[in-house]
Amino acid sequence: MSLVIVGSLAFDTIQTPWGRRDRIVGGSGTYCSLAASFFTNPKIVGVVGKDFPAAVLRLFKARGVDTEGLEVRPGKSFHWEGHYGYDPNLRETIRTEINVYEGYRPQLPASYRKADIVLLANIDPDLQDDILIQVRKPKLVAMDTMNLWIGSKPKAIRRVLKKVDILFANDEEIRMLTKEANLIKAGKKILAAGPRLVVTKKGEHGALVFGRKFIFGVLAHPCEDVVDPTGAGDSFAGGFLGYLDKIQRFSHPDIRRAAVYGSVLASFAIEDFGIDRLKTLTQREIGARFRRFKKLVSF
């Protein structure tokens, strides 16, 4: 039972119709790790500056997140600023400051190299490729990406795609990557490139999971109060892989159940700004919402 998550730890400045928050803790690695920690003890890999809150590092420890792979450097942590309108699926990037990520090359501690599952969260595809050289025969490798990397490093994306089992990306990114408007055709194109699964995140409409012999759709939990959608996709990936790491099985029913747990974690993450909701979330709440999902799709 071993899940390694390689991703960003950052400060986010977020403006939504429901409010504004300046320099709150976020980042793909942060959301993925906290979501996964409800099922397993993930190991995180990333870099932060001296300004990163010690309280969050204590939170990781309390949740069983292994931080041996977390590097603290002199300087400022990664900072992203973005704006959301009333459509939570659309966001505008105002500013990105990479700070301590300048020149960063992740190095896995020896204890991380035998991981069963590796998640290459939303980082530079060249860094994702570096990680794959360092791991030894994982059972499952997943990657996430974004339109920035698809547009600027398409060859690197395709190179990494050939080496992974799962791609997580939203519908816009899937279409951009394949130049296909139809998501089913797009999913088949990506499967032909190497991965065994394509998980297409569709925001408030849930997600589609494409396998070579099946397609599975999962709802997004109906939510009246969408406060901050920033960490939804990363929380989905963390919940999905955290559950698979817990059970150590990868059958079609297991994949379907993992997708529902991913959607459950995402539905909680959006209820407050940043990681605040994940900090107060309980196993009891997760179980109750999972059962509610079953009722939503039963007929």
What are these regions (language model features)?
Residues 11-23, 38-120, 132-138, 287-299:
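Conserved N-terminal subdomain of the carbohydrate kinase-like
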Residues 56, 127-134, 155-159:
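A short acidic, amphipathic alpha-helical/loop segment
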Residues 36, 170, 233:
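Short, conserved phosphate/pyrophosphate- and ester-handling motifs at nucleotide-, phospho-/glycolipid
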Residues 1-4:
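Extreme N-terminal starter segment of soluble prokaryotic enzymes
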Residues 34, 80-83, 206-210:
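Short beta-strand scaffold segments in enzyme catalytic cores
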Residues 183-299:
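Conserved phosphate-binding/catalytic region of the ribokinase-like
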